[in-house]
Amino acid sequence: DLSLSMKDDLDTIRNLGTKLAEEMRKLTSNFRLGFGSFVDKDISPFSYTAPRYQTNPCIGYKLFPNCVPSFGFRHLLPLTDRVDSFNEEVRKQRVSRNRDAPEGCFDAVLQAAVCKEKIGWRKDALHLLVFTTDDVPHIALDGKLGGLVQPHDGQCHLNEANEYTASNQMDYPSLALLGEKLAENNINLIFAVTKNHYMLYKNFTALIPGTTVEILDGDSKNIIQLIINAYNSIRSKVELSVWDQPEDLNLFFTATCQDGVSYPGQRKCEGLKIGDTASFEVSVEARSCPSRHTEHVFALQPVGCRDSLEVGVTYNCTCGCSVGLEPNSARCSGTGTYVCGLCECSPGYLGTRCECQDGENHSVYQNLCRDTEGKPLCSGRGDCSCNQCSCFESEFGKIYGPFCECDNFSCARNKGVLCSGHGECHCGECKCHAGYIGDNCNCSTDISTCRGRDGQICSERGHCLCGQCQCTEPGAFGEMCEKCPTCPDACSTKRDCVECPLLHSGKPDNQTCHSLCRDEVITWVDTIVKDDQEAVLCFYKTAKDCVMMFTYVELPSGKSNLTVLREPECGNTPNAMTILLAVVGSILLVGLALLAIWKLLVTIHDRREFAKFQSERSRARYEMASNPLYRKPISTHTVDFTFNKFNKSYNGTVD
């Protein structure tokens, strides 16, 4: 993917060829690699089509103002063992820019699969196609947004310059077409995608046989390890694919893997090693009888292998007993032909022995058309004629049975589908196809979805029910019950291997470390990705009270991929004086704060009281009055008396 968002990834893989070749030559002595790139269809709305963008679609983009014109797919280097040519070709590449988020990656994958001569696929080699991107793909019918209504024809359209010429003429390929062409050319597709798109491409692997998906780092630094892991996974797995299966045939698979256990409904085995044997039993069932002398052919092929088994199917729908016919047989009351134990009545006659004539009144025998006394004739779903039921026709299906008590449409449904589409309805009960159980046949007995990358079922901490792990080990959880912090599992057993290489741990020398880690592949990192769905997170306390963390992923080869922190996470040792000063300072600050709050409250209270006093004083109105206790210094008294010293009376005042 050479869209603009992959610029940092391109910088990372410029010297990929040398390192990849070194690692792959540890696995195979005959290794070749090639290179191609894609962006998207060069039409609107997928790309910038205005004239100003024709030579530089990044014009006006401040972060990266210069890039090459957009293109669909370019095959840049045929498969070769010259690693320097690969590195040189990668160094020449520059990114481009498309308009929408999805990429035209499936156009590129299909051309890489069908252009065998130009790519250089060898007939007897194992074919790996590594597809890297950081976004979602365009799929079939998306091309209609750009006016492309012609479906993809699945053919090679590379010109002399090895450029895809039908990019702006045909729609994107469908997943079915992609899977067909990959299988037809024995190509194993590896989706190397960023974590936020992992689940989308994981779902694609269920629709495209022979594909695997791996999580790509944001800058593609792990691309080599990713390819090695996918290669080991492919080499340790065998899966059967079916080609040209007739519609009227049901195929039922039973796989017997390296453990010798048979798995009904499973068509693949994983975790295989050199010398292991896997066998498959295939049962063929005819759902209907085609016309006479019809012969069908289908093929069984291991995914990614060119060998196949072609199976020819002939149908035998005639019974041997039909040779001896007895016309007008006494067993049929002389009015019918006895064939294969049954009577075929002449026109106008009815009954199991042709004993009745059409139109006769046989109401006296109608009780023979009831299952039990009191029930409706023919269960209310048929007419009673000549002591037997003739069942009505129904738009929903077939009504049948001696008393019309059965049908093939009244069984349990799942999401609106009768018997979940995995069984046949017989008289109100689902008869499940091989590989399915349950009242409505919604429960698959296929345990491949519960098998981890290490070949274990539910990590041996649970059982597989309906294709999903039900964890029984206390504390276990995860899609494969692979996570269990409280279990005495690999976290404790792998701890010695993790501790041994650490210089400060006091563990034994390198020879001992080699012995402890003989089944481990250790990668040292500065930070641990804690939300990795594929990995199990482990941590423990060291002697220095630090926390050491690591993750592990079980590989199909039986080894484990350990990702370990370079240094344990340690907190700073607290200083006693610092703690003392902090405590004393805190107490003083709290005391001062309380005093300040108290002073503030008292001041507020006093101000309120003084304001209240001032308010009452301003409202007071007093009347003028004298003090009853006050006496003036001068007083006047009036006295009435009679003075008769001289025999005179006198009235007056005395001061």
Swiss-Prot record:
| Protein name (record) | Integrin beta-5
The entry's localization annotation reads:
Cell membrane
Q: Which domain of life is it from?
A: Eukaryota
Q: Which residues carry this modification: Phosphoserine?
A: 626
Transmembrane spans: 576-598
I-EGF domain residues: 321-355, 356-405, 406-442, 443-482
Q: Which residues are glycosylated?
A: 203, 316, 408, 442, 510, 561
Q: Which residues lie on this side of the membrane: Cytoplasmic?
A: 599-655
Q: How does it assemble?
A: Heterodimer of an alpha and a beta subunit. Beta-5 (ITGB5) associates with alpha-V (ITGAV). Interacts with MYO10. Interacts with DAB2. Integrin ITGAV:ITGB5 interacts with FBLN5 (via N-terminus). ITGAV:ITGB5 interacts with CCN3. Interacts with tensin TNS3; TNS3 also interacts with PEAK1, thus acting as an adapter molecule to bridge the association of PEAK1 with ITGB5.
Please report which protein family the annotation says this sequence is part of.
Belongs to the integrin beta chain family.
Which amino acid positions bind Ca(2+) 1, per UniProt?
Answer: 5, 8-9, 218
Tell me any Pfam family this protein matches: Integrin_b_cyt
* Residue pairs linked by disulfide bridges in the UniProt entry: 58-67, 115-156, 257-269, 289-317, 321-340, 332-343, 345-354, 356-386, 369-384, 378-389, 391-404, 406-427, 411-425, 419-430, 432-441, 443-466, 450-464, 458-469, 471-481, 484-487, 491-538, 497-517, 500-513, 546-570
A molecular function GO annotation: metal ion binding
| Residues that bind Ca(2+) 2 | 40, 98, 100, 102-103
Per its UniProt record, what PROSITE patterns does this chain match?
Answer: EGF_1 (PS00022), EGF_2 (PS01186), I_EGF_1 (PS00243), I_EGF_2 (PS52047)
Name the gene for this chain: ITGB5
Residue ranges annotated for the VWFA domain, each copy included: 1-234
> Matching InterPro entries, A to Z?
I-EGF_1, Integrin_bsu, Integrin_bsu_cyt_dom, Integrin_bsu_tail, Integrin_bsu_tail_dom_sf, Integrin_bsu_VWA, Integrin_dom_sf, vWFA_dom_sf
One GO BP annotation here?
A: transforming growth factor beta receptor signaling pathway
Keywords, A to Z, come to: Calcium, Cell adhesion, Cell membrane, Disulfide bond, EGF-like domain, Glycoprotein, Integrin, Magnesium, Membrane, Metal-binding, Phosphoprotein, Receptor, Repeat, Transmembrane, Transmembrane helix
So which stretches are on the Extracellular side? Answer: 1-575
- Location (main, coarse): membrane
GO CC annotation: what is one? integrin complex
